[in-house]
Amino acid sequence: MSNPVSINNSGSISNSNLNNESLSPSRLSSSPNSKSMELNGKRTLKSSVVKTLLNRSSSGNNLNNTVTTRRAAGSFTSNYQNIYTPNNNSYNSSNNNNNNNNDDDTVSVDGDNPPDSPKSTKDHSNSVGSNSGGGGGGSSGGLNMSMNNIKQQQQDNLIKQQQKDRSLWTVRSLKEHAEVLDIMERLKPVNRAISFGQIYAREETQFDFDPLIGRDTMLQLILQHLQFEGLMDSRKLLEEEARVQYPEYAINESRLVTLLRTALKDSERVFQLTLDDKKRDSQQQLEEHLAFLGLFKDETATDIMGEDVNIYDEPENSNIIYVDDKEKEKEKEKEKEKEKDKFGPNSTNSLSGSGSSPNIPSGMNNNSSSIGNNSIGNSNSYSNGELSPLSASTLLMMSPQNKNSIETNKPQVKAASLNKLVILLTPDNNHDLEYTKTFLLTYQSFTTPEMLLEKLVQRYHVPQKPGQSLDDWKKSAVPIQLRVANVIRTWIKDYFSDFNDKLIQNVKSLYENMKQSGNMSHAKILSESLNAKIKGMVGMDDQKRAPTFTSPAPEPKVPKNIWSQTLDIFSVDEEEIARQLTLMDFEIFSAIKSTELLNQSWNKPKLRHRSPNVLTLINRFNEISQWTATSILSYPKVKDRARIMAKFIKIAEYCMRHLNNFNTSMAILSGLNASSVHRLKFTKEELPKHTQQVYTELQFHLSSAQAYKEYRALLAKANPPCLPYLGVYLTDLTFFEEGNPDFIQGFINFGKRKLIYGSISNVQSFQNAKYNLQPVYQITKLLKGFKLLEENDLYSRSMSFEPRNKERSEIL
C-alpha cells in the first residue's frame, strides 16, 4: 500500500517519503521558475485522472479515499476531490474543520477548484490521519460495490429507454391529454375528429329503425323523385327490386329535392368547416377586425327589435321612420340633374339601320370595353372606377313602377321595427300591393319564416279594446283578418319553398282555429291555397302565364346538310344561330327565381346552392365567351380567322338589334375582347369595312363605361321579349347590399329592401314575355357540344399565329 503524502498549511511535506516529490502539485505551484512545468503537470495530471477513471473504475485498486459520484442528464460523473493516485502513489490534501479555510487548504490540479469539484461540494476527501489506519481495503471494497451498482443501474436505464414503445405516440398522447385533443380540434376542425362531435353531441339512443326517416320512407322519396322527373322505367325497376309499391301522389315538386334544400339551408354554417386553413383564418381575422370596429354582421342573427313584443303592444306612433318631404324634394332635384347629364337627347344612337355611325368617343375603336376582363361571374368588380354604379335612386327611377311610386304623395317608409312592418303589411284599408311584394321577397334578410308567421298570427287575433262594443270590434277586426289571410295566401302561392313541414302544420292550425271561430271564408282562403300547392294543382294565374302568340313563329333557316355529321357553324346561317342561342339562354334566364338574387348568394361559396339558375347562366355566359375565342383561334391562317370572327360579329349584332338579346351579345363581345383575340391585329384588319364598323358599334353600345350608360338606355327602349345582360343586375344588387346599412337607428332599413326589390322586379318583368321562336334540335345540339380551350392555350396559339414585331407578309 502506498504511503500518503500530507501537505500542511505552510506548504511543507510531513511525510519522509520524497520519491515523488518533484510531482507534488504544491511544489509545482510554489516554485518561481516552474510555469512551464506547471502547465505540463496540469495536462499530465488531468489526463491521468481521466485514464485512471476509465481503466480502474471497475476494480477500485489503489483508491484510498472516497470517490463522490454524481448522475446528471442520464450519465454519471466521478468527482475526485483533492485525490491523485498515479502509479500506486497518492497525494492527499488534508481537510480542515474550519469551512472558511477550505479554499486555501484544497489542492487543485488546475491551481484552482477543478471543474468537477465545485466549492459548494460538501463531500470532501478524508485527511491522512483518518485514512492511514488500515481502512483503505474496506473503502476500496465499498467503492467496488458502489461503482458496479451504478453501472448496472445505468445499463438497465439504457435498456428501458431502448425498449420503450414509440409507435403511435401522437394518438396515445392525445388519449392521455384530452385537453390537447380538444384544442387541436377547435383550431383545425378540418381534421374531422369524430370524438369532438361525440363530446358535444346529444346522448345517443339506439333504435332498431330510424324514427325520422326509415328505409320505406326513403324509398318512397326516391320513387316520387323518379316519378316527378319522368323516369318511369327506373321507377318500375326500383319497385321490383325493392319490392315496394309506389302510390302516385299529385305533387308538383320533388319532395326529395325539397328536403335536401332544406337540409342545406339549415346547415349553411357547416360549410365553414370545409374551407382550407388559410382561407378560414383570413376570414376569421376579417370578422374579428370588423367586430372590433363594430361593423360585423352575423348572417344568422335574427335579434330584431320587436320580435319579442306582441304586435298589439307596440306603441302606435313610434318605432317607424318616414322619408321627409325635404329629403324627397332634394332627391328629385338631384335625379333630374343626373338625368339631363346622363340621358340627354344626344347621348344615345338608334340601332335601326347601319348607315349612320354613332358618336364614338375617342379611343373607343382600339380599346375594348374591358368586358372580357369583367365577366358576368365577377359582376361586383367595380372598384376600379370603370364599373362605378349609378346611384340607387337613379337605378330605381329607370323602372316605371318605381317612378310612379316616387311621384305619389304617399308617405314612404324608410325604417321601422318588425311589428310596424307587419302592421303596414296587413292594414285595415289602403292596401299597397308593391309593399306586399317587396316585403315577401326580402323579409328573409331581416327575419325568419317562422317569426313572420308568428307575427301574422298575432296580427290576426285582434284584441277587443276595453269598452268597445262587439259590432265596433268586428268592423275594425274583420278587414285586418281578411288582409292577413290574403297575405298568407300570396306568401304560399309565390314563395312556397319557404314553408317546411313545421310551418305547414302551423298554417293548418291557424285555419282550424279560423273554422272554430266561425271565420269559414278566411279558413277557405288558406286551405285552398295550401292544398293547391301540396297537390300540385295549377291556378288560374299560372295558366295566364303560359305563352300565347298571335302570330306563328318564323320559319327556321335550316341548312341543307342538317342531317349530316359534317354539320358545323359555317353551315348554319348567323340569324338562325342567334335564334337558337337566344332560346337556350332565355330558358335559363326565365328559370331564375327571385330568391336566387338575394344576399349575393351567387357570389358566396356557402350560399351558392341558393342560386342554381343564376350560376347556370353565369357559366353559360362564360362558355359562349370561351367558345368565341376558341373558334377564332382554331384556324392558323389569317383569312380563316377573319372569316369566323366576322361570323361571330354578325351573330352578336343580330342578337342585339333584332332579338333584344343583350346577354348573348355581351358574351360574344367578351370573347372578341379576350386578350388572346384582341391582340390579333392582322386578323381584324382582314375584316370587311362594314363588319369593322359593326364591331365598333357593339363595343360602344355594350361598353361598361359610366355604369353601362349606353346599354341601360338601349334596354329602356327595348320592347319585349328581351333578354337583358344579367351582369348589370348582379352589379346593382351587390351595390345595394354593400352600400346600404341593414339598420337605421336600430330599425330595419326597409328603403334598402325597396332598392333590391326594384332591381329584382325588373328581372321578373323580362321573364314574363317569351320568345316566339322554333327550336331546331340539330343546331341546338351543335351549339351545346363545342370544345373549349383554356386561357393559357388560347394565348399560346395567339402568340404563335401572330408573333410580336412581325410584318403582315410574314404571317400566314
Swiss-Prot record:
Residues 75-86 have a biased composition (Polar residues). Residues 409-535 form the N-terminal Ras-GEF domain. This is Ras guanine nucleotide exchange factor J. GO terms for cellular component: plasma membrane. Promotes the exchange of Ras-bound GDP by GTP. The keyword Secreted does not apply. Keywords: Guanine-nucleotide releasing factor. InterPro entries: LisH (IPR006594), Ras-like_GEF (IPR008937), Ras-like_Gua-exchang_fac_N (IPR000651), Ras_GEF_dom_sf (IPR023578), RASGEF_cat_dom (IPR001895), RASGEF_cat_dom_sf (IPR036964). Residues 131-141 have a biased composition (Gly residues). PROSITE patterns: LISH (PS50896), RASGEF_CAT (PS50009), RASGEF_NTER (PS50212). One of its GO terms (biological process) is Ras protein signal transduction. It comes from Dictyostelium discoideum (Social amoeba). Residues 1-146, 320-382 are annotated as: Disordered. PANTHER family: GUANINE NUCLEOTIDE EXCHANGE FACTOR, RAS GUANINE NUCLEOTIDE EXCHANGE FACTOR I-RELATED. Residues 323-343 have a biased composition (Basic and acidic residues). The keyword Heme does not apply. One of its GO terms (molecular function) is guanyl-nucleotide exchange factor activity. Residues 573-804 form the Ras-GEF domain. Residues 1-36, 53-65, 87-101, 344-382 have a biased composition (Low complexity). Residues 214-246 form the LisH domain.
